[in-house]
Amino acid sequence: MTEVLVTASFPADLMARISAVSHSLEVAQLDLSRRDWPEGRATTAEILYSYGAGKLPPLDLAPNLRWVQFHTAGINRLRESEIWHSDILLTSASGIHAPNMGQYVMAQILAWANRTPTWFYYQQRGEWPAGRWDKFLPDELRGRTLGILGYGSIGREVARLAKAFGLTVLASKRDARDVKDHGYMVPGAGDPKGVTADRIYPGAAAR
């Protein structure tokens, strides 16, 4: 049996789904959503699902640990840590947030273009204002230009959605010569080949 320790505050039904992945897994839970790893607490787990850097055990207390999957996308803060320079496999959730964040960005753009905050303002006041045609007349997105600084998984999903509204998309990334996305991307989302944006500039060009 492979021991798996989950330090996220997952509900019982989700923990059951994790356990059901394989009969060879022995899954346990230690909720560290509101605290760091308990001092002196040892574990024999081989796989750890962790909320973040502060939720990790000292390596001398986790002699069997072989793989840590992080709940978050960014783990750069671990670069100077003991575990970063060990043989333990470290993986993150980078890429999974693109559909939700892309949807959120487009929701804000559409709210701005359609004067939604203005609608709500007058609705809450129970007022039908003078000059309302000028106040409520929406802007059309088609033909406008959207700039995206950082063409990672989220930026690429924003680009994909923006093109559906007829926007011209200009993006920037650190290395504009390598336009492909080499990380995980939710199937059907984003721009894995780097062909959706109308133009991709090097990051220095955005300064």
Positions of PLM-derived features:
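Phosphate/diphosphate ligand-binding glycine-rich loop within oxidoreductases
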Residues: 44-124, 138-142
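Short beta->alpha connector loops
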Residues: 9-12, 31-34, 50-56, 71-75, ...
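N-terminal glycine-/charge-rich "phosphate-binding" loop or analogous flexible N-terminal tail
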Residues: 1-47, 177-182, 186
